[in-house]
Design a protein with these regions (language model features):
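Hydrolase active-site cap/lid region
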Residues: 59-110
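Serine-hydrolase catalytic core
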Residues: 93-193, 199
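Eukaryotic short linear interaction motifs
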Residues: 2-4, 40-43, 74-78, 139-141, ...
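Active-site catalytic motif of lipid deacylating hydrolases and related acyltransferases
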Residues: 1-31
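Short glycine-enriched nucleophile-adjacent loop
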Residues: 40-54, 66
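Extended, charge-rich low-complexity interaction segments
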Residues: 22-40, 191-200
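Alpha-helix termini
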Residues: 22-26, 51-59, 155-157, 194-197
């Protein structure tokens, strides 16, 4: 949760990832992003650094594909974190209200960063193909939000987008609950990108 509510920490993590990707041993390798849950929010920090810092700009051109499993960005944080934390409706409501209050109080600083990164994520500057995984009963990653993002990338950004929406599986547990379908979708995605598929 600290990474979600502290943009500076998220930026540090994003910087570490990008430094690895531009290292001598990795700088010529193709990249496939595979983000889970708040990895969608962390990916927005990666996108921001690639756009704003020249030293990371080469990574953008090397991203061949993007896999997002149950992505949660800024707008889903109060809903997602509170639902992940407790089954108790009162505790969920208190936590959701507390997070919303935190974001309102620190709007001048934290929320401004969140909104800018959310906008960047939804208007993804990386136009390589994307694959979404989500489920209809995920208590953290809202199905309508995931679907709207996939549709926007496909219809407004003209990206190649595939998706696998499961009837039922818990947050970021789609691989375990629907192992065969998940694995086949990833393999097909990588084959379509012309990237060798390793044995999973």
């Amino acid at each position: 949760m600290l990474q979600i509510l502290r943009p500076k920490k998220a930026e540090q993590v994003a910087t570490e990832v990008l430094n690895k990707l531009i290292s001598d041993e990795n700088k010529h390798r193709p990249v496939v992003i595979h983000g889970f849950s708040v990895g969608g929010y962390l990916y927005s920090h990666v996108l921001n650094l690639m756009v704003k810092q020249d030293r990371f700009s080469s990574v953008k051109e090397r991203i061949r594909g993007q896999v997002l499993d149950s992505p949660v960005d800024f707008h889903g944080i109060p809903y997602g974190v509170s639902n992940a934390a407790s089954e108790n409706p009162l505790v969920r409501w208190l936590m959701k209200s507390s997070i919303e209050a935190y974001l309102a109080i620190f709007a001048r600083y934290t929320t401004k960063v969140y909104l800018a990164h959310s906008h960047l994520f939804h208007n993804n500057p990386v136009r390589s193909p994307a694959l979404f995984f989500f489920s209809k009963d995920d208590k953290v990653a809202d199905v309508d939000t995931c679907q709207a993002c996939a549709d926007y990338w496909k219809n407004e950004l003209n990206m190649t987008v595939s998706q696998q929406c499961f009837e039922s599986s818990p947050h970021v547990s789609h691989f375990y609950v629907h192992n065969k379908e998940y694995t086949e979708a990833v393999k097909k995605f990588l084959r379509d990108l012309n990237i060798p598929v390793v044995t999973l």
